[in-house]
Amino acid sequence: MDTLLKTPNKLDFFIPQFHGFERLCSNNPYHSRVRLGVKKRAIKIVSSVVSGSAALLDLVPETKKENLDFELPLYDTSKSQVVDLAIVGGGPAGLAVAQQVSEAGLSVCSIDPSPKLIWPNNYGVWVDEFEAMDLLDCLDTTWSGAVVYVDEGVKKDLSRPYGRVNRKQLKSKMLQKCITNGVKFHQSKVTNVVHEEANSTVVCSDGVKIQASVVLDATGFSRCLVQYDKPYNPGYQVAYGIVAEVDGHPFDVDKMVFMDWRDKHLDSYPELKERNSKIPTFLYAMPFSSNRIFLEETSLVARPGLRMEDIQERMAARLKHLGINVKRIEEDERCVIPMGGPLPVLPQRVVGIGGTAGMVHPSTGYMVARTLAAAPIVANAIVRYLGSPSSNSLRGDQLSAEVWRDLWPIERRRQREFFCFGMDILLKLDLDATRRFFDAFFDLQPHYWHGFLSSRLFLPELLVFGLSLFSHASNTSRLEIMTKGTVPLAKMINNLVQDRD
């Protein structure tokens, strides 16, 4: 969806990618059963779907990294200049903060191993989110609305425009503003940060050391600089997607497919259907034309996450059922997104934003629009506490504490706690229960489901949202929410009571 990553964290369930992709994984229970001996029909079914998945992978081209044609002003390593802000990571979050802090006249150094590389991620956003940030020119395709297929014969039309982010345009726009504002760049990885009373020293893999008043970790899910002090056990959203040229597809080109939970494509694959009934996946699709489309099979959230191989097999079966013949794949992506889990230590010396700061929506996996909207909050706090002469005494730990406080105020922490409660319920739902949940969810007034997906509802409205969802749910779904949500609800209430400013 909008937070897709090609370079995930090191996860025990993650299978090596294309070129060395392990098609029959020895620790996959499904394939173990095949080797131990099952009926010949089952072996043929397995062989059929695996060969379909393999055929799909055979169309994936060699990865070509594309760089933007910019002359980046480099950080002068010979001068040992102390910068106001050192940003580790050149993704959307890092560049957004760099752009806004430098606009206020502060010195900024952006550190990234590939600062001109076009982001590999496919980002999808609601158009109103980018419109609010004056970024409509960074959408290359928009759809008048979206559709959700809950089940065969149950379809929800969502009259909320959706867009695909033009990665090249967004990064070009941000880089140009950074260059104009005087941001300096250093091409390297960061291995460590050493803190002193007033400043910090960023240690790079090439031996360069950069001193800064504030260090911002915008590296995504690496969690290498920002510290955590609680067990990290998130749910995982896992997906496999392709931008493909096809003979045709059955979807309306004026609407994107937000979720397709139908499973008729698995009728011929009982093993896959059984697994999908327990931990379901859905199709997310952005049709650009009648013969070009982005297709992605997604596990919304699971713990542990589904294996990439499993998702690719389900996708191959779905495309075959839909009659979608893939002629050529322009690019593919394998996505692993940690969701939920604890927030980092608040406060701490290194400031974070985006995935490293726990900003992924725990119930949906959304992050891009939320992070870009948070960039001005972080930037304004840094400028306010660092750039004003009256704040000269505010340095080091005190300065970072104020920035963290602005990024994660109590109302945002309470909001996130509610979203984690939602994730904990989703983790317990099988396919039928998931369908019932989203059948009720998308029947809510648009204000509520819009606000939930875009992180615009805060605790008072979230309580109304929860009651409204419960009232729209079927009796079966209400019973499921009550029985499976009791422990997560108690956990949420306990965390809310303990969390005070």
Swiss-Prot record:
It is found in: Plastid, Chloroplast. The keyword Transmembrane helix does not apply. The modification N-acetylvaline is found at residue 49. NAD(+) binds at residues 85-113. Signal peptide: none annotated. Keywords: Acetylation, Carotenoid biosynthesis, Chloroplast, Isomerase, NAD, Plastid, Stress response, Transit peptide. GO terms for molecular function: lycopene beta cyclase activity; oxidoreductase activity, acting on paired donors, with incorporation or reduction of molecular oxygen. Belongs to the lycopene cyclase family. Plants overexpressing LYC1 exhibit improved tolerance to salt stress. Involved in carotenoid biosynthesis. Catalyzes the double cyclization reaction which converts lycopene to beta-carotene and neurosporene to beta-zeacarotene. Major lycopene beta-cyclase that does not seem to be involved in neoxanthin synthesis. Involved in salt tolerance improvement by increasing synthesis of carotenoids, which impairs reactive oxygen species (ROS) and protects the photosynthetic system under salt stress. This is Lycopene beta cyclase, chloroplastic.
